[in-house]
Each structure stands twice: as structure tokens, then as C-alpha cells.
Amino acid sequence: MSSYLFTSESVSEGHPDKIADQISDAVLDAILAQDKRARVACETMVKTGVAIVAGEVTTSAWIDLEALTRKVILDIGYNSSDVGFDGETCGVLNLIGKQSPDINQGVDRKNPEQQGAGDQGLMFGYATNETDSFMPAAIHLSHRLVEQQAKIRKKKNSALSWLRPDAKSQVTLRYEDGVATAIDAVVLSTQHDPGVKQKDLIEAVREEILKPVLPAKWLHKGTKFHINPTGKFVIGGPVGDCGLTGRKIIVDTYGGWARHGGGAFSGKDPSKVDRSAAYAARYVAKNVVAAGLADRCEVQVSYAIGVAEPTSISVTTFGTGKIADEQIEKLIRKHFDLRPFGIIQMLDLIHPMYQQTASYGHFGRKPKDFTYTDGTGAQHSATSFSWEKTDRADALRAAAKLK
């Protein structure tokens, strides 16, 4: 019997890198609400007292970048210099310019179906049936822990009102013959007000954050809990560390369990295959697993700049496939249009929804219907996390002729 440990981590919405991701995606959302043809590549850096927003944008829209940036920071919970960062008073520097026409000529086409990829690159999507979210268990639990920290922190009349926005989690699982059987270690570090006793913090975190999230069946007397192991975490957020867009790509995806092509997501409109094709690859892999074609599935796609058709599509099921990987690949090519325009249409990606993705993972979330207001004041219905739907599983299963 083989036995091994595997670890994944996550960070909260108040982590400096996640502040940057959320600002970049808030800018993207605000522009897409007014201009569906916009091209956006927005990068953010946050450090003590300042947020720098830079990048390349081609759009007819106008947004109040300073007000938008401040709102994101304040909504996260950085509203006082006492906390270490204040959205009301921090500086906001706008360094956004226009996108290169050399890129535009490679992407835009008279026939939208022939829209070229915005850049070359390779992307991976992954799914597993070890959790209800079709995500690896370690990253799933890590996300839920920091999400719970934020929920408790923002709760009205919270008993843990001394919690601050910055937090990190880490979960180590023990696997026996490829099956998760126990939690070996948990790390939860949370920023807090000064004067909080370590004993009180540990007890509160155990009861209010860890217990509601961690499955009791995986906890045992040997499980190690490391709660604020340095003893104090008062200085956090952009004061403690400089934050940058796109620096948490493993947190954003599969926690290291699956491979990664290297491209970040936040601040990029759907013409950038770094983002849209990674979402599509997850959609494909999840439907393959939901169809029962495999217990685990990893899909790789790759592109050349200005070219519509993927340069490759490959599938790996790690020996768990109910049919050959080559057959699954043929089914994918038949049932999914993985050209850039095909992905955008298939997943309905051109509308505001991206700030929601910028914390607690881009994958393993539930599709959510919502409405938004465009630049004319008109209301529109849309769905976020559409790539998490399993609406093609039945067709795949039927085509594979599985009983």
C-alpha cells in the first residue's frame, strides 16, 4: 500500500497579492459593463499607502479608476491606518496606456469565429471526483478556511471582531493508495488587532474557522494544528508585503496538484487565452469526470498568437479512464469548440463577473446567476463561474456508450 502526504495553500481576500488581483478584475468588470469589445490587460501593485494600476487597454468606456480602486480596498476591510492600509487616504497612481496595434491585428477578424488567440501559450484544466466540487481536497479545504475567516470577520456583531483582513491557510492530507484518508496538518495564520491573547486567538480560530470547515472524518488525534505559529500577526496587508497581480497562480488553480501553464488570470479580458482557455480546460475536464469517463482528468490546450485553432489538445486520466485517453480526446474535439471565440460563446465570458473570481479560487465554485447594469443604465442577466457547469456530461457519456 502506498502512502504519501500532499499540501496546498490559500490566501484571503486581504492578502496583498489578492488585493491587487481584485483591483485588476474590478477594472476589467467596470470596462466590460460599458464596452464588450474592450481589450484589457490590467496589472496592480499595492504597498504602504499606495496602489499603482498599470497596463494596456483599448476601449470606448470611461471609468473612475481612483474611486473604483478605493472601493475595492475599503470593501475588503482596509479602512484605517490602524489596520495598516486605508482606502480613503492611500494614493492611487494610474499608469494605464493603449494596447499595441500589433496585437490587435492578430486577434481581431471580420469573421469573429476566426478570432486569433491573443498570445501563444499552454493552459491546463483539471478535475477529480474526490470532492463534490470536483477539486483536489487540499486546495478545496484551504480555500474554505480563509473564506470562513472573512465571513466571520465581516459578520455583524462578530465575536471575533479583532480579526483583520490578511490571512493564509494550508492543509496537508494523507493519501493511501491514491485516496485521501486523513488530515495530517493544518496551518491558519490570521492578522489580528494588537492585545489579543494567543490562547484566546487559538481557541476562537479552532471553534469558529476550523471546525465548521474541516471534515470530522479526516481529523484524528495526530492531526497537527498550527494557528498563528509565530505568535503575533498584527502587521499585515500591503504594509507587511508588497502585493502584485498574478502572483498567486497556484492558489488560483489546483493548489499544485495539477500542472500549470504559467499564465495568470486577473486583469485579463477573455480574448487572452491565458484566462479563457484555462477556464475552458477546466470545463472540459470537469464534464469528463462528471460523465464518469474518468476519476481524474487533466486537459492541456495550446495556442499560437493570431491563430484560432489550438495547436494541441491533450488528455491525461492517470490510469483512471473508463475508456482510452485517445477516445476521450476525440470526444472533446467533437463536443467542445476550443477556438478563442468558441470558448467565449460557449462559456458566455464577456460580461462583468471577474472580481468574484479573484479570491478563494477560480475553480470549484458554484455558478451564480446575477444582474448587472451597463453603461446606458440597462439591466442584464448573466452567470458567473459558467465553466463549473456539468451540462455536457450526459452527452459525453452517451457518446462514449458507457452504461
Curated annotation (Swiss-Prot):
GO terms under biological process: one-carbon metabolic process; S-adenosylmethionine biosynthetic process
Keywords (A to Z) from UniProt: ATP-binding, Cytoplasm, Magnesium, Metal-binding, Nucleotide-binding, One-carbon metabolism, Potassium, Transferase
Top-level division of the source organism's lineage: Bacteria
Residues holding Mg(2+): 17
Cross-referenced Pfam families: S-AdoMet_synt_C, S-AdoMet_synt_M, S-AdoMet_synt_N
InterPro entries, alphabetized: ADOMET_SYNTHASE_CS, S-AdoMet_synt_C, S-AdoMet_synt_central, S-AdoMet_synt_N, S-AdoMet_synthetase, S-AdoMet_synthetase_sfam
SUPFAM superfamilies in the record: S-adenosylmethionine synthetase
Region (Flexible loop): 99-109
Annotated binding of K(+), by residue: 43
Broad enzyme group: transferase
Binding sites annotated in the UniProt record for ATP: 15, 166-168, 232-233, 241, 247-248, 264, 268
Residues that coordinate or bind L-methionine: 56, 99, 241, 272
Compartments, as annotated in UniProt: Cytoplasm
Gene3D superfamilies: 3.30.300.10
Documented EC number(s): 2.5.1.6
HAMAP family in the cross-refs: S_AdoMet_synth1 (MF_00086)
Family to which the UniProt record says this protein belongs: Belongs to the AdoMet synthase family.
Function: Catalyzes the formation of S-adenosylmethionine (AdoMet) from methionine and ATP. The overall synthetic reaction is composed of two sequential steps, AdoMet formation and the subsequent tripolyphosphate hydrolysis which occurs prior to release of AdoMet from the enzyme.
NCBIfam families with a match to the protein in the record: metK
Official protein name in the record: S-adenosylmethionine synthase
Gene: metK
